[in-house]
Every structure is written in C-alpha cells, then in structure tokens.
C-alpha cells in the first residue's frame, strides 16, 4: 500500500532585501526549516520505507512531502469469535460475537435471545465451581460427549450436538420443522 503525506508550510510574504534583490527568510521560518530537516534526519520507520523531499522556494511557501509505503507483515488476526449455538432450553439458534481474549483468558457469559437464560461459554477465572475445572465450552461439552466445531475461515465457533449432526431432521425444533428454515 503506498501512501503520500504532504505538509505545506506557509509563511508570510517573502521580504525583498533592499540591495541586490535577494529573497530573505525571516528568523522564524529558518527555525521551522531547521526543525523539519532535524526531524527528517532523526525519523526512522521500522516497517516502512521513507523518502522525504523538501521543495524549492516557489515564492508561495515551502512544501514538505513524505512518501512512504507500508506492507503488511503477516496477516491481520481477528480479535473476536462468532459463537453460533442452539439453546437447549428453548431451541433458539443464535449467533454472538465474543472476544478471543475473554474466551481464552477471562469469562464469557451469553444471554439467549429466546428465553433470556444466561449460558457460560468460558470460565478461565474459576468463578463457577460447578464446572469442575473445565475452562471453556469445548471442555464442558467434551465431558458430556458433545462437540464444538471450529470454522477458522470466518473465525466462528459452532456448538453442535453429535446426535443432531448425524440426524439433522430429528433434532429440529417444532417451530422450524415446517420448512421455514431460518439462517
């Protein structure tokens, strides 16, 4: 990706010296130019290439442009998971966006939109003693003989009961069995 940043430093009208017709730069402008050149020499960008150009005096102002290009180092990592699950209480299928940090190092509790029940998805801080040391939904369901399917391309966790995966029509809730499948 190439980017170009340009800064235009305007100064008041250049004064013409009385003798030889030479342009003179006021003291404040010399300090600004010196500061710009100092910043150019001290600036270093580790992940980009930098080229600085100081324009010539055109009588309108001093132009200062920086051109740099940055290239992605590796891939950007998503910071969230999309949790897709079916509530066992009311059979509502829903999707929630949860933080990866909370899932792996904190506590995640989601609320079912159908029955308003709270479901523990992850407990890495050991807040809930009834989980018997299990830290996340994958470990909780593995102890019950169920599985969690990870879909890496879309950063999603899908909770699927093994029986419903083998017999999808038998486990379908009554409000979805009439052919009006929600997606």
From Swiss-Prot:
<dbReference type="InterPro" id="IPR024158">
    <property type="entry name" value="Mt_import_TIM15"/>
</dbReference>
<dbReference type="InterPro" id="IPR007853">
    <property type="entry name" value="Znf_DNL-typ"/>
</dbReference>
<keyword id="KW-0809">Transit peptide</keyword>
<feature type="binding site">
    <location>
        <position position="112"/>
    </location>
    <ligand>
        <name>Zn(2+)</name>
    </ligand>
</feature>
<feature type="binding site">
    <location>
        <position position="87"/>
    </location>
    <ligand>
        <name>Zn(2+)</name>
    </ligand>
</feature>
<feature type="binding site">
    <location>
        <position position="115"/>
    </location>
    <ligand>
        <name>Zn(2+)</name>
    </ligand>
</feature>
<dbReference type="GO" id="GO:0050821">
    <property type="term" value="P:protein stabilization"/>
</dbReference>
<protein>
    <recommendedName>
        <fullName>DNL-type zinc finger protein</fullName>
    </recommendedName>
</protein>
<keyword id="KW-0496">Mitochondrion</keyword>
<keyword id="KW-0479">Metal-binding</keyword>
<keyword id="KW-0143">Chaperone</keyword>
<feature type="compositionally biased region" description="Basic and acidic residues">
    <location>
        <begin position="162"/>
        <end position="183"/>
    </location>
</feature>
<keyword id="KW-0862">Zinc</keyword>
<dbReference type="GO" id="GO:0051087">
    <property type="term" value="F:protein-folding chaperone binding"/>
</dbReference>
<dbReference type="GO" id="GO:0030150">
    <property type="term" value="P:protein import into mitochondrial matrix"/>
</dbReference>
<dbReference type="GO" id="GO:0005739">
    <property type="term" value="C:mitochondrion"/>
</dbReference>
<feature type="region of interest" description="Disordered">
    <location>
        <begin position="160"/>
        <end position="183"/>
    </location>
</feature>
<comment type="function">
    <text>May function as a co-chaperone towards HSPA9/mortalin which, by itself, is prone to self-aggregation.</text>
</comment>
<keyword id="KW-0863">Zinc-finger</keyword>
<feature type="transit peptide" description="Mitochondrion">
    <location>
        <begin position="1"/>
        <end position="62"/>
    </location>
</feature>
<dbReference type="GO" id="GO:0006457">
    <property type="term" value="P:protein folding"/>
</dbReference>
<feature type="binding site">
    <location>
        <position position="90"/>
    </location>
    <ligand>
        <name>Zn(2+)</name>
    </ligand>
</feature>
<feature type="zinc finger region" description="DNL-type">
    <location>
        <begin position="76"/>
        <end position="173"/>
    </location>
</feature>
<dbReference type="GO" id="GO:0008270">
    <property type="term" value="F:zinc ion binding"/>
</dbReference>
<dbReference type="Pfam" id="PF05180">
    <property type="entry name" value="zf-DNL"/>
</dbReference>
């Amino acid at each position: 990706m190439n980017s170009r940043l340009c800064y235009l430093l305007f100064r008041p009208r250049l004064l013409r010296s009385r003798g030889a017709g030479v342009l003179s730069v006021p003291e404040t402008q010399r300090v600004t130019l010196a500061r710009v050149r100092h910043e150019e020499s001290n600036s270093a960008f580790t992940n980009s290439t930098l080229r600085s150009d100081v324009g010539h005096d055109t009588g309108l102002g001093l132009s200062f442009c920086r051109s740099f290009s940055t290239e992605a180092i590796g891939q950007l990592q998503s910071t969230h998971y999309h949790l897709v699950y079916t509530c066992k209480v009311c059979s509502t299928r829903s999707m929630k966006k949860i933080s990866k940090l909370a899932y792996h190092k904190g506590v995640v509790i989601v609320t079912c939109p159908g029955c308003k029940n709270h479901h523990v998805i992850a407990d890495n801080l050991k807040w809930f003693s009834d989980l018997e040391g299990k830290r996340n939904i994958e470990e909780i369901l593995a102890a019950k003989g169920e599985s969690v399917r990870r879909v890496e391309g879309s950063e999603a966790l899908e909770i699927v009961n093994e029986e419903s995966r083998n017999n999808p029509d038998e486990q379908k809730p009554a409000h979805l069995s009439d052919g009006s499948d929600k997606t």
